């Protein structure tokens, strides 16, 4: 059933190739070159890999991008000073602090030090508040949930009246994902570690989004036949002495039940980076007073 697999890698490449044209036109027509600064504190190997991927994609698209590597001993006050300097630099349009940060640094304080107009992760309280109060056009939306919704809408444009279940309640994925689905007029249920009879909720979902970080947590028996299944999880496991990455959904069985399903890897992951680039260009346009420029190129 290859035809029911949602190829996030191909879809993300379509988005970024269109975005590259948008960026070039933005430069030519408005003399604006979007600029993204990524701040990485410490030496976490996974974080360094993520940041390299973001940097590579930004450069491919014609964005101006820079990674600031700071030692793990960087003080909270020093990091705040760095962010404030970038906030005041009109040539910088997007600021991203790669998470996690060292334990001596208050993550929420750092996120909310970023100018909300430059908060391309969409985590600042102001952006969160606007999203939750239905002001989607006036905020930067978290990249992973935005990418998930885009994938869902490649399967069906009309979600109105659909029953949607989001497994997970994180601020990064679960909560904003539920909010975006509400905005599409879905009836949304959020389930989590304390939910009783969790499979019963899942089995009623027309749209099921799994974001719990537990390998193969969602069984095929939980899935409603014909459901759209979006697997946000990316979990490292060892199988026969070989390290591999799997999702939160038991993909091998679930693919036979779902009408459409994302694989891991190659599903949601590429969309997260694609929408980070989209958010950076939107932020640049907003700061330059250019309205609805990206929307001329991408159906957002």
UniProtKB/Swiss-Prot annotation:
Catalysed reactions, semicolon-separated: (6R)-5,10-methylene-5,6,7,8-tetrahydrofolate + NADP(+) = (6R)-5,10-methenyltetrahydrofolate + NADPH; (6R)-5,10-methenyltetrahydrofolate + H2O = (6R)-10-formyltetrahydrofolate + H(+)
This enzyme's EC code(s): 1.5.1.5, 3.5.4.9
GO annotation, cellular component aspect: cytosol
Residues given in the record as NADP(+) binding sites: 168-170, 193, 234
Xref: InterPro entries: Aminoacid_DH-like_N_sf, NAD(P)-bd_dom_sf, THF_DH/CycHdrlase, THF_DH/CycHdrlase_cat_dom, THF_DH/CycHdrlase_CS, THF_DH/CycHdrlase_NAD-bd_dom
The keyword Amino-acid biosynthesis appears for this protein: yes
Annotated GO biological process: L-histidine biosynthetic process; methionine biosynthetic process; purine nucleotide biosynthetic process; tetrahydrofolate interconversion
KW NADP (keyword) present: yes
Pathway the protein acts in: One-carbon metabolism; tetrahydrofolate interconversion
Xref: Gene3D superfamilies: Leucine Dehydrogenase, chain A, domain 1, NAD(P)-binding Rossmann-like Domain
MF GO annotations: methenyltetrahydrofolate cyclohydrolase activity; methylenetetrahydrofolate dehydrogenase (NADP+) activity
Keywords per UniProt: Amino-acid biosynthesis, Histidine biosynthesis, Hydrolase, Methionine biosynthesis, Multifunctional enzyme, NADP, One-carbon metabolism, Oxidoreductase, Purine biosynthesis
Pfam families cross-referenced by the UniProt entry: THF_DHG_CYH (PF00763), THF_DHG_CYH_C (PF02882)
PANTHER family: C-1-TETRAHYDROFOLATE SYNTHASE, CYTOPLASMIC, C-1-TETRAHYDROFOLATE SYNTHASE, CYTOPLASMIC-RELATED
Family: Belongs to the tetrahydrofolate dehydrogenase/cyclohydrolase family.
Cited function: Catalyzes the oxidation of 5,10-methylenetetrahydrofolate to 5,10-methenyltetrahydrofolate and then the hydrolysis of 5,10-methenyltetrahydrofolate to 10-formyltetrahydrofolate.
Quaternary context: Homodimer.
Name this polypeptide is given: Bifunctional protein FolD
Organism field: Ehrlichia chaffeensis (strain ATCC CRL-10679 / Arkansas)
The encoding gene: folD
């Amino acid at each position: 059933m290859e035809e029911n697999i949602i190829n996030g890698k191909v879809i993300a490449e379509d988005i970024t190739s269109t975005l590259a044209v948008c960026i070039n036109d933005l430069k030519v027509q408005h003399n604006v070159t979007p600029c993204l600064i990524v701040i990485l504190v410490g030496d976490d190997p996974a974080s360094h890999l993520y940041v390299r991927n973001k940097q590579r994609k930004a450069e491919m698209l014609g964005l101006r991008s820079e990674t600031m590597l700071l030692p793990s001993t960087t003080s909270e006050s020093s990091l705040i000073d760095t962010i404030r300097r970038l906030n005041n630099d009109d040539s910088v349009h997007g600021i991203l602090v790669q998470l996690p940060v060292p334990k001596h640094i208050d993550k929420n304080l750092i996120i909310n030090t970023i100018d909300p107009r430059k908060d391309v992760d969409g985590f600042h309280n102001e952006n969160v508040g606007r999203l939750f109060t239905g002001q989607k056009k006036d905020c930067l939306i978290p990249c992973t949930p935005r990418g998930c919704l885009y994938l869902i809408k490649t399967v069906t444009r009309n979600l109105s009246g659909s029953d949607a279940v989001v497994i997970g309640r994180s601020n990064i994925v679960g909560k904003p994902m539920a909010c975006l689905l509400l905005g599409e007029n879905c009836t949304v249920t959020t389930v989590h570690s304390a939910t009783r009879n969790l499979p019963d909720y899942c089995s009623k979902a027309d749209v099921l989004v799994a974001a719990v970080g537990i390998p193969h947590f969602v069984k095929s028996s939980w899935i409603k036949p014909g459901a759209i299944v979006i697997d946000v999880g990316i979990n490292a496991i060892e199988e026969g002495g070989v390290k591999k990455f799997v999702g939160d959904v038991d993909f091998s069985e679930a693919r036979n039940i779902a009408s459409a399903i994302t694989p891991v890897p190659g599903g949601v992951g590429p969309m997260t980076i694609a929408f980070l680039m989209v958010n950076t260009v939107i932020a640049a346009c907003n700061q330059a007073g250019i309205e609805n420029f990206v929307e001329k190129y991408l159906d957002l």
